[in-house]
Design a protein with these regions (language model features):
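Bacterial N-terminal signal peptides
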Residues: 9-19
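Extracellular/periplasmic carbohydrate-active domains that bind, remodel
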Residues: 20-455
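Bacterial N-terminal signal peptides that target proteins for export
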Residues: 1-11
Length: 455
């Protein structure tokens, strides 16, 4: 018998395994949405159960999980997403915002997606030249409790891979995400409370593992990312960019980050083979260059980001190892602010320690503020990074001021500037402390800048 576990001190009941609801497989070429949805509904109505997807391809539109149901993908099973947006009934959040996914749960409790099978998002069937066309996520949970995601593979989602919104008491373990349809194909995006992400392997075209806050009134807190591997063309481990409310008590520990394995060169001519998980002959693959940032902690939308721990990170293949940014993007509603409590436009209490590896770009790590947000109480400890020197560059030093407070917060912000350090640049930040921080020039390279510059 499974025992309840405790996650962040909150008791989380283990999902109860009862009699499976058996569903016969079809030929794998016509949509099976209605059949699988009926099985899910029947299991929930019976008080709970396990719906098993057998080996083989199973084309489907959007499936809605119900309370007390586990969707189990047997080894060799593949849910193949329909390429027709009409097969995804939108889920509304915040009144009008619509979301779609291959597998979704909305306001349900005690649910799971498990097994050694695969969810194939069929991204190439969607028209990326039409940005207005809906792009369904792979897995979506909104306003749910006691959710477990274990062991399955999610490949080539049209939108975000795993999208978690306002969920609590959740475990994501040993999930593999391999998704490279282009921009906005994040691996795992989290907005919730009491969540553990452990031993996952994420390879994504956009940000790999990301914690966000869209709702001023909903604190995002108590999130642990542990033992994960991240590959990204953009950013590996990230808090932001959406930072409208509170994000607190988040840790990334014992993780590795490397550059993404693959990405598409052109988002327009997509192969449209419903059942083929690999691009058709002639599809424009190419190996991408380094990712943008490995460790990214941001507060740019007027929120509060605090008590962040990043520890024991091995990295290679990113232009900027550490990017900590306070900003002031347009669109913040000042009527929401509670400046008397020091809550808004605040980025504080961040500890980054035991980071080692090799950078793959000439933009240094940065701790910077702009506009109404200055990072405060930032600790960098036991950091050992190899940096490729830029040589004897006589270009005058320059860096962005408050005129860039609303710029998109990632290391590309500094591309048109010549920062005055090759290892770490600190500007408009308070209480930045360093202990045993080493930036070593790569063998055979030089750099006329100092390793560290604090303004």
């Amino acid at each position: 018998m499974n025992r309840p576990m405790k996650l962040f001190g909150v008791a989380v009941a283990a999902i109860m395994a009862v009699e499976s609801v058996a569903v016969a497989s079809t030929d794998g070429h016509r949509l099976e949405t209605a059949k699988w949805q009926a099985a899910i509904d029947a299991a929930s109505a019976a008080g709970g159960g396990v719906v098993e997807i057998p080996a083989g391809d199973h084309p489907t539109g959007m499936l809605r999980l119900k309370s007390n149901v586990e969707l189990r993908l047997q080894e060799g099973a593949r849910l193949v997403a329909s390429g027709d947006p009409a097969d995804y009934k939108p889920v509304k959040m915040h009144g009008s915002t619509e979301f779609r996914a291959v597998v979704a749960g909305v306001s349900v409790t005690n649910v799971a997606v498990t097994g050694k099978g695969e969810i194939f998002g069929n991204a190439w069937a969607f028209d990326y030249a039409r940005r207005s066309q809906p792009k369904p996520s792979g897995v979506l949970f909104i306003d749910c409790r006691m959710v477990r995601l274990d062991d399955f593979t999610l490949r080539d989602a049209a939108g975000w891979g795993v999208d978690i919104k306002k969920c609590e008491d959740m475990v994501i373990r040993r999930v593999k995400v391999d998704s490279h349809a282009g921009v906005c194909t994040d691996g795992i995006d989290i907005e919730g409370r009491n969540i553990l992400i452990e031993d996952c392997d994420v390879d994504s075209g956009d940000d790999a593992i990301c914690v966000k806050s869209h709702d001023v009134g909903y604190p995002v807190e108590n999130i642990v990312v542990r033992g994960c591997s991240a590959r990204s063309h953009c950013n590996a481990f990230k808090i932001g960019t959406a930072t409208h409310g509170v994000i607190r008590n988040v840790s990334f520990v014992h993780c590795r980050a490397f550059a993404a394995r693959r990405v598409y060169r052109d988002l327009a001519p997509m192969p449209k083979d419903l059942l083929n998980s690999r691009p058709v002959k002639g599809a424009p693959w190419y190996l991408c260059g380094p990712g943008f940032g490995c460790i990214n902690v941001e507060c740019v939308d007027g929120g509060l980001v605090e008590n962040i721990v990043v520890d024991d990170i091995e990295m290679e293949g990113y232009r900027s190892p550490i990017f900590i940014r306070g900003g002031d993007r347009r669109g913040f509603n000042d009527s929401h602010a509670d400046t008397s409590q020091g809550r808004w436009f605040t980025l504080r209490n961040v500890v980054v320690s035991n980071v080692r590896g090799k950078a793959d770009g000439r933009t240094p790590s940065t701790v910077t503020g702009a506009g109404r947000c200055r990072p405060c109480n930032i600790v960098l400890k036991d950091i050992d990074l190899e940096i490729p020197g830029e040589g004897e560059n006589r270009k005058p030093y320059s860096w962005p001021g408050d005129d860039k407070a609303g710029a998109y917060p990632q290391t590309t912000l500094f591309d048109s500037y010549h920062l005055p350090a090759y290892g770490l640049f600190v500007d408009k930040a308070d209480g930045v402390r360093m202990d045993n921080v080493k930036f070593r020039l790569r063998s055979g390279t030089t750099d006329s800048r100092p390793a560290i510059c604090e303004k």
